[in-house]
């Protein structure tokens, strides 16, 4: 037997030994995986039972509070606060457990488990989401500038509007996955992206014509301004979130948003004039489109639908921002009155 063949035989025996170890490691891995699945099922079942009992207890306390004495009312209030805190703990626990997807994720992805099991994986996905928003915001800004000043073609407008549809669709999917993993983004700032997806889709279907050309430059100028504001928000919100997470005041899955939230009060109030300017520009778009819809040459259904959609965006953005500002001002006044 030649020396080369002997070396090959020795290497095969080494590989055989390593393969046996690999098989044993894989067997242990599958065993642990089954144990993990059993623990996940047990935890989910226990949480659901606890939630049901706490819900019943909360209803009982609410009924009892109506005819309780002053001392009893204080006890009921304390128990109610504890129940609310316990529900927040359950929310954090469920972020690490498999759960059924919501209707939207079921329609898009099917009944696939999107729960990430480690903090590292959750934060990596969240960070990748933030980078995606930043890169697409820059691309959309450049696209809007190009269409507004250099490329006066309907086909380039369609490419830009298609990019908007894809961007907002992707955001809604990624945000739904982040919510399933414990992100606390909620309310209007979630719905806002669904409305924006619809608006971009209607813009994409709007045929070229006199009415479209009358609104085109105004919409592209609005898109440029909106992208600039979103870039500013991302840049400053990310730094603010990093600081607040280091102080233990924010969750590691909190996201940057295209609006104003209570945690931005310290350090980011200078963004409010830009935000309100963007909100009123949406109102201006709505008014312009309502006027164009009554034009004698207007035949497109998209004009009136877009006017309503811009009005919905204005009302949602403006009222939500106004509510946050009003709440923070009231809290500051209450703190100032305390000795």
Swiss-Prot record:
InterPro entries on file: TMEM120A/B (IPR012926)
Transmembrane segments: 102-124, 132-152, 159-179, 187-207, 270-290, 302-322
Entry GO terms, CC: nuclear inner membrane
Membrane topology according to the record: Multi-pass membrane protein
Subcellular location: Nucleus inner membrane
Coiled-coil residue spans: 1-77
Keyword set, alphabetical order: Coiled coil, Membrane, Nucleus, Transmembrane, Transmembrane helix
Single biological process term from Gene Ontology: protein heterooligomerization
Keyword Transmembrane: yes
PANTHER family registered for this protein in UniProt: TRANSMEMBRANE PROTEIN 120B, TRANSMEMBRANE PROTEIN INDUCED BY TUMOR NECROSIS FACTOR ALPHA
Family recorded in the similarity comment: Belongs to the TMEM120 family.
Function comment: Necessary for efficient adipogenesis. Does not show ion channel activity.
Assembly, per entry: Heterooligomer with TMEM120A.
Name used for this protein in its record: Transmembrane protein 120B
């Amino acid at each position: 037997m030649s020396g080369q063949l002997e070396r090959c035989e020795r290497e095969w025996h080494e590989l055989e030994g390593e393969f046996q170890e690999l098989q044993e490691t894989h067997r242990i891995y599958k065993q642990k995986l089954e144990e993990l699945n059993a623990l996940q099922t047990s935890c989910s079942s226990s949480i659901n039972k606890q939630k049901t009992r706490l819900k019943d207890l909360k209803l009982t306390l609410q009924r009892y509070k109506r005819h309780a004495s002053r001392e009893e009312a204080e006890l009921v209030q304390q128990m109610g606060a504890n129940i609310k805190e316990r529900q927040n703990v359950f929310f954090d626990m469920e972020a690490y457990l498999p759960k059924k997807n919501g209707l939207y994720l079921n329609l898009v992805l099917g009944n696939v488990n999107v729960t990430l099991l480690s903090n590292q994986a959750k934060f990596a996905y969240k960070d990748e989401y933030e980078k995606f928003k930043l890169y697409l915001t820059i691309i959309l800004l450049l696209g809007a500038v190009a269409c507004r000043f250099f490329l006066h073609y309907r086909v380039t407008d369609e490419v830009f509007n298609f990019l908007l549809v894809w961007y907002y669709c992707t955001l809604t999917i990624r945000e739904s996955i982040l919510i399933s993993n414990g992100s606390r983004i909620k309310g209007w700032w979630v719905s806002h992206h669904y409305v924006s997806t619809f608006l971009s889709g209607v813009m994409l279907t709007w045929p070229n014509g006199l009415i479209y050309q009358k609104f085109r430059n105004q919409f592209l100028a609005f898109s440029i301004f909106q992208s600039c504001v979103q870039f500013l928000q991302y840049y400053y919100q990310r730094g603010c979130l990093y600081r607040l997470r280091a102080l233990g005041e924010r969750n590691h899955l909190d996201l940057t948003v295209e609006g104003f939230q209570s945690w931005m009060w310290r350090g980011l109030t200078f963004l409010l004039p830009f935000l309100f300017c963007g909100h009123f520009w949406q109102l201006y778009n709505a008014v312009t489109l309502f006027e164009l819809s009554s034009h004698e040459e207007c035949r497109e259904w998209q004009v009136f639908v877009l006017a309503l959609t811009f009005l919905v965006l204005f009302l949602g953005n403006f009222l939500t921002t106004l509510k946050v500002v009003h709440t923070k001002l009231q809290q500051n006044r209450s703190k100032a009155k305390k000795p």
